[in-house]
Amino acid sequence: MTRKIAIYGKGGIGKSTTTQNTAAAMAYFFGKRIMIHGCDPKADSTRLILGGMMQTTVMDTLREEGEEGVTLDRVRLQGFGEIDCVESGGPEPGVGCAGRGVITAINLMEDLNAYGDELDFVFFDVLGDVVCGGFAMPVREGKAQEIYIVASGEMMALYAANNICRGMVKYAEQSGVRLGGIICNSRRVEGERELIEEFCARLGTRMIMFVPRDNIVQKAEFNRKTVTEFAPDSEQAQVYRELARRIIENDHFVIPTPMTMDEMESLVLKYGLLDLGEAS
């Protein structure tokens, strides 16, 4: 059965990079059949898998050719590791709702049976925080069964992760979606690992992987590749391999217990991310 996973996190935290590198590791090291469905109007969730190519989005095709023009041949491309790639896209700037575009694109892909049983994993790479109903759709309507949140030891990344968990709790009972863990995409913050581990414990989940910061990630991106394709024998490729393995073997799924604002403030104060002047 296809496992459907949504990756959330604060804007700029590295969701797309983490998703693509994890998917590439699953395909290359474990032979898994993967699809990435980008749910961001920037349509950049699959560019490393596709060698830097910006593909035609579902919403662009829908606007230009109508619903009958949206076929898998038009909007689905295959890249590294035979990973299938789809981008939702969004409305023209200043017009319409990008969240509605996510809803429309996912529904169209379901109608076309894009998430078929031949796939082992489908990843939904979702824009930023749970900011509106459209971007919360993978959680709200059970389009994804598993959620992983990309965070770091930075204050705003933790606040965003906590807010995402609050959104999950609202819909978890009706949709069956569960939190699979937190992926720490390290920013080299002092005490970062310990902070994330305590943060996860407060949420009732675990840090599924600590991804160290390594310049080879940027070098691979400059060459329009994932780390696995660019340098499969590198230490960082092995980090993504281990992250892929842990997700494949994960059986620890929970409804999180988000913190109150006072609890969040206490946590970041404990680790020196917020001084008392800022807190007042």
From Swiss-Prot:
Keywords, comma-separated and alphabetical: 4Fe-4S, ADP-ribosylation, ATP-binding, Iron, Iron-sulfur, Metal-binding, Nitrogen fixation, Nucleotide-binding, Oxidoreductase
Post-translational modification summary for this protein: The reversible ADP-ribosylation of Arg-100 inactivates the nitrogenase reductase and regulates nitrogenase activity.
Residues annotated to bind [4Fe-4S] cluster: C97, C132
Family matches, as InterPro entries: NifH/chlL_CS, NifH/frxC, Nitrogenase_Fe_NifH, P-loop_NTPase
Reactions that this protein is recorded to catalyse: N2 + 8 reduced [2Fe-2S]-[ferredoxin] + 16 ATP + 16 H2O = H2 + 8 oxidized [2Fe-2S]-[ferredoxin] + 2 NH4(+) + 16 ADP + 16 phosphate + 6 H(+)
Cofactor remark: Binds 1 [4Fe-4S] cluster per dimer.
First-tier enzyme category under EC: oxidoreductase
Cofactor(s) this protein requires: [4Fe-4S] cluster
GO biological process: one example: nitrogen fixation
EC number of the protein: 1.18.6.1
Signal sequence region: none
Origin superkingdom: Bacteria
Pfam families found in the cross-reference section: Fer4_NifH
A molecular function GO annotation: nitrogenase activity
Binding site for ATP: G9, K10, G11, G12, I13, G14, K15, S16
In-chain residues carrying the UniProt-annotated modification ADP-ribosylarginine: R100
Known partners and oligomeric status: Homodimer.
Function: The key enzymatic reactions in nitrogen fixation are catalyzed by the nitrogenase complex, which has 2 components: the iron protein and the molybdenum-iron protein.
PANTHER family in the cross-refs: LIGHT-INDEPENDENT PROTOCHLOROPHYLLIDE REDUCTASE IRON-SULFUR ATP-BINDING PROTEIN
Family: Belongs to the NifH/BchL/ChlL family.
Name by which UniProt lists this protein: Nitrogenase iron protein
Taxonomy of the source species: Bacteria, Bacillati, Bacillota, Clostridia, Thermoanaerobacterales
Protein encoded by which gene: nifH
